[in-house]
Protein backbone atom coordinates (compact mmCIF):
# COMPACT_ATOMS: atom_id res chain seq x y z
CA UNK A 1 0.00 0.00 0.00
CA UNK A 2 1.35 3.42 -0.98
CA UNK A 3 2.05 6.11 1.56
CA UNK A 4 0.31 9.48 1.71
CA UNK A 5 1.72 12.98 1.25
CA UNK A 6 0.83 15.72 3.72
CA UNK A 7 1.53 19.40 3.20
CA UNK A 8 1.88 20.62 6.78
CA UNK A 9 1.81 24.30 7.70
CA UNK A 10 3.99 24.92 10.76
CA UNK A 11 2.88 28.53 11.22
CA UNK A 12 4.99 31.70 11.22
CA UNK A 13 7.67 30.92 13.80
CA UNK A 14 6.50 30.16 17.32
CA UNK A 15 6.16 26.36 17.69
CA UNK A 16 3.26 26.91 20.11
CA UNK A 17 1.21 28.31 17.22
CA UNK A 18 1.29 24.97 15.42
CA UNK A 19 -2.10 23.27 15.32
CA UNK A 20 -2.76 20.01 17.14
CA UNK A 21 -3.46 18.33 13.79
CA UNK A 22 -0.14 19.54 12.36
CA UNK A 23 1.78 18.15 15.35
CA UNK A 24 -0.03 14.80 15.23
CA UNK A 25 0.49 14.50 11.47
CA UNK A 26 4.24 15.10 11.76
CA UNK A 27 4.47 12.61 14.63
CA UNK A 28 2.81 9.94 12.50
CA UNK A 29 4.96 10.47 9.39
CA UNK A 30 8.28 8.56 9.26
CA UNK A 31 9.58 10.86 6.52
CA UNK A 32 9.90 14.66 6.73
CA UNK A 33 10.46 16.78 3.61
CA UNK A 34 11.70 20.38 3.74
CA UNK A 35 12.11 23.01 0.98
CA UNK A 36 15.83 23.46 1.66
CA UNK A 37 19.15 21.69 1.07
CA UNK A 38 18.81 19.96 4.43
CA UNK A 39 17.03 20.16 7.77
CA UNK A 40 19.78 22.35 9.22
CA UNK A 41 18.88 25.02 6.62
CA UNK A 42 15.08 24.75 7.00
CA UNK A 43 13.29 27.19 9.31
CA UNK A 44 10.16 25.04 9.04
CA UNK A 45 12.07 22.05 10.45
CA UNK A 46 13.43 24.15 13.32
CA UNK A 47 9.92 25.32 14.20
CA UNK A 48 8.47 21.79 14.18
CA UNK A 49 11.40 20.50 16.23
CA UNK A 50 10.43 22.96 18.95
CA UNK A 51 7.29 20.97 19.77
CA UNK A 52 7.51 17.56 18.05
CA UNK A 53 9.75 15.16 19.95
CA UNK A 54 12.22 12.80 18.25
CA UNK A 55 12.31 14.74 14.98
CA UNK A 56 15.94 13.72 14.58
CA UNK A 57 14.83 10.07 14.50
CA UNK A 58 12.87 10.61 11.29
CA UNK A 59 14.20 10.40 7.76
CA UNK A 60 14.52 13.88 6.25
CA UNK A 61 14.47 14.82 2.58
CA UNK A 62 16.14 18.11 1.66
CA UNK A 63 14.20 19.27 -1.41
CA UNK A 64 15.30 22.79 -2.27
CA UNK A 65 13.87 24.90 -5.09
CA UNK A 66 15.77 27.57 -7.03
CA UNK A 67 14.95 31.21 -6.31
CA UNK A 68 13.86 32.11 -9.84
CA UNK A 69 10.76 33.16 -11.75
CA UNK A 70 11.69 31.02 -14.78
CA UNK A 71 8.72 28.65 -15.04
CA UNK A 72 10.58 26.01 -17.04
CA UNK A 73 13.31 25.78 -14.40
CA UNK A 74 10.74 25.70 -11.60
CA UNK A 75 8.55 23.05 -13.27
CA UNK A 76 11.59 20.85 -13.84
CA UNK A 77 12.48 21.20 -10.17
CA UNK A 78 8.92 20.45 -9.01
CA UNK A 79 8.96 17.27 -11.09
CA UNK A 80 12.29 16.19 -9.59
CA UNK A 81 11.12 16.92 -6.04
CA UNK A 82 7.86 15.05 -6.64
CA UNK A 83 9.75 12.01 -7.89
CA UNK A 84 11.85 11.93 -4.71
CA UNK A 85 8.70 12.03 -2.60
CA UNK A 86 6.98 9.37 -4.71
CA UNK A 87 9.91 7.01 -4.07
CA UNK A 88 9.08 7.16 -0.35
CA UNK A 89 5.35 6.81 -0.99
CA UNK A 90 6.07 3.67 -3.01
CA UNK A 91 7.86 2.29 0.06
CA UNK A 92 4.58 2.67 1.94
CA UNK A 93 5.84 5.63 3.96
CA UNK A 94 3.79 8.73 4.74
CA UNK A 95 5.62 11.99 4.02
CA UNK A 96 5.10 15.32 5.81
CA UNK A 97 6.26 18.25 3.66
CA UNK A 98 6.78 21.20 6.03
CA UNK A 99 5.91 24.73 4.96
CA UNK A 100 6.09 28.07 6.75
CA UNK A 101 2.73 29.63 7.50
CA UNK A 102 -0.04 27.87 5.57
CA UNK A 103 0.47 25.59 2.54
CA UNK A 104 -2.29 27.37 0.58
CA UNK A 105 -0.56 30.78 0.59
CA UNK A 106 2.39 31.22 -1.82
CA UNK A 107 3.79 27.79 -1.02
CA UNK A 108 5.92 25.55 -3.23
CA UNK A 109 4.06 22.59 -1.77
CA UNK A 110 0.90 23.08 -3.81
CA UNK A 111 2.77 22.54 -7.11
CA UNK A 112 4.26 19.33 -5.76
CA UNK A 113 0.88 18.09 -4.54
CA UNK A 114 -0.64 18.59 -7.99
CA UNK A 115 2.03 16.40 -9.58
CA UNK A 116 1.83 13.73 -6.89
CA UNK A 117 -1.98 13.52 -7.11
CA UNK A 118 -1.84 13.44 -10.91
CA UNK A 119 0.40 10.38 -10.57
CA UNK A 120 -2.35 8.66 -8.58
CA UNK A 121 -1.16 9.17 -5.00
CA UNK A 122 -3.16 10.53 -2.07
CA UNK A 123 -2.30 13.94 -0.60
CA UNK A 124 -3.77 16.25 2.02
CA UNK A 125 -3.21 19.82 3.21
CA UNK A 126 -2.86 20.50 6.94
CA UNK A 127 -3.44 24.19 7.60
CA UNK A 128 -1.14 26.42 9.59
CA UNK A 129 -1.43 29.95 11.00
CA UNK A 130 -0.59 32.38 8.16
CA UNK A 131 2.27 34.77 8.90
CA UNK A 132 0.16 37.87 8.27
CA UNK A 133 -2.39 36.80 10.90
CA UNK A 134 0.40 36.37 13.44
CA UNK A 135 1.83 39.78 12.49
CA UNK A 136 -1.54 41.50 12.98
CA UNK A 137 -1.92 39.83 16.38
CA UNK A 138 1.58 40.89 17.38
CA UNK A 139 0.78 44.49 16.40
CA UNK A 140 -2.51 44.27 18.31
CA UNK A 141 -4.69 45.27 15.38
CA UNK A 142 -7.11 43.75 12.87
CA UNK A 143 -6.42 43.12 9.20
CA UNK A 144 -9.84 44.35 8.10
CA UNK A 145 -12.85 45.91 9.83
CA UNK A 146 -16.49 45.75 8.70
CA UNK A 147 -16.64 46.55 4.96
CA UNK A 148 -12.89 47.08 4.51
CA UNK A 149 -11.25 45.16 1.68
CA UNK A 150 -8.11 43.11 2.24
CA UNK A 151 -5.57 42.34 -0.50
CA UNK A 152 -2.64 39.91 -0.40
CA UNK A 153 0.12 41.09 -2.73
CA UNK A 154 3.33 39.26 -3.77
CA UNK A 155 6.07 41.90 -3.42
CA UNK A 156 8.51 40.12 -5.73
CA UNK A 157 6.40 41.46 -8.64
CA UNK A 158 5.37 45.03 -9.52
CA UNK A 159 3.28 46.36 -6.63
CA UNK A 160 2.61 49.93 -7.81
CA UNK A 161 -0.90 49.36 -9.17
CA UNK A 162 -1.85 46.86 -6.46
CA UNK A 163 -1.11 49.43 -3.75
CA UNK A 164 -3.75 51.71 -5.30
CA UNK A 165 -6.49 49.19 -4.54
CA UNK A 166 -8.97 50.23 -1.81
CA UNK A 167 -8.63 48.78 1.67
CA UNK A 168 -5.69 47.23 3.49
CA UNK A 169 -2.81 45.40 1.84
CA UNK A 170 -0.60 42.54 2.97
CA UNK A 171 2.79 42.57 1.26
CA UNK A 172 4.39 39.14 1.16
CA UNK A 173 7.60 37.73 -0.35
CA UNK A 174 9.35 41.08 0.09
CA UNK A 175 12.71 39.86 1.45
CA UNK A 176 15.02 40.38 -1.54
CA UNK A 177 12.90 43.23 -2.96
CA UNK A 178 12.57 45.24 0.24
CA UNK A 179 14.49 48.27 -1.01
CA UNK A 180 12.19 48.49 -4.07
CA UNK A 181 9.11 48.02 -1.89
CA UNK A 182 10.22 50.83 0.43
CA UNK A 183 10.77 53.14 -2.52
CA UNK A 184 7.26 52.57 -3.88
CA UNK A 185 5.67 52.95 -0.44
CA UNK A 186 7.42 56.30 0.04
CA UNK A 187 6.50 57.51 -3.46
CA UNK A 188 2.82 56.78 -2.79
CA UNK A 189 2.90 58.12 0.76
CA UNK A 190 1.77 54.78 2.17
CA UNK A 191 2.00 53.89 5.86
CA UNK A 192 3.34 50.43 6.64
CA UNK A 193 4.40 48.18 9.50
CA UNK A 194 6.62 45.14 9.26
CA UNK A 195 7.69 42.24 11.46
CA UNK A 196 10.76 40.23 10.58
CA UNK A 197 10.95 36.63 11.88
CA UNK A 198 7.58 36.91 13.62
CA UNK A 199 7.39 34.62 16.65
CA UNK A 200 11.08 33.71 16.57
CA UNK A 201 13.98 34.70 18.82
CA UNK A 202 15.27 37.02 16.09
CA UNK A 203 11.93 38.86 15.82
CA UNK A 204 12.16 42.54 14.91
CA UNK A 205 9.28 45.02 14.65
CA UNK A 206 9.40 48.06 12.36
CA UNK A 207 6.78 50.75 12.91
CA UNK A 208 7.44 52.80 9.77
CA UNK A 209 8.84 52.53 6.25
CA UNK A 210 11.95 54.47 7.29
CA UNK A 211 12.74 51.91 10.01
CA UNK A 212 12.65 48.96 7.61
CA UNK A 213 15.94 47.40 6.39
CA UNK A 214 16.91 47.31 2.72
CA UNK A 215 16.83 43.50 2.60
CA UNK A 216 16.13 40.44 4.76
CA UNK A 217 17.06 36.76 4.18
CA UNK A 218 14.63 34.69 2.10
CA UNK A 219 12.78 32.27 4.45
CA UNK A 220 12.79 28.51 3.79
Language-model-derived ranges and their functions:
Residues 39-41, 68, 130-133, 200-202:
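Short gly/pro/ser/thr-enriched loop/turn and capping motifs at secondary-structure boundaries
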Residues 1-2, 24-25, 89, 97, ...:
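Solvent-exposed alpha-helices and their adjacent loops that cap or buttress functional pockets
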Amino acid sequence: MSGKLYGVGVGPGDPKLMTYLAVETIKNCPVIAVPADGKEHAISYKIASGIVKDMDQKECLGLSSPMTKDRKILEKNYQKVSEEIIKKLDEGKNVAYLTLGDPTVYSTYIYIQRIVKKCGYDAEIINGVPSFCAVAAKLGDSLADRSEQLHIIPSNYDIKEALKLPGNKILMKAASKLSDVKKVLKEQGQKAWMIENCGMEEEKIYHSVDEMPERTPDPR
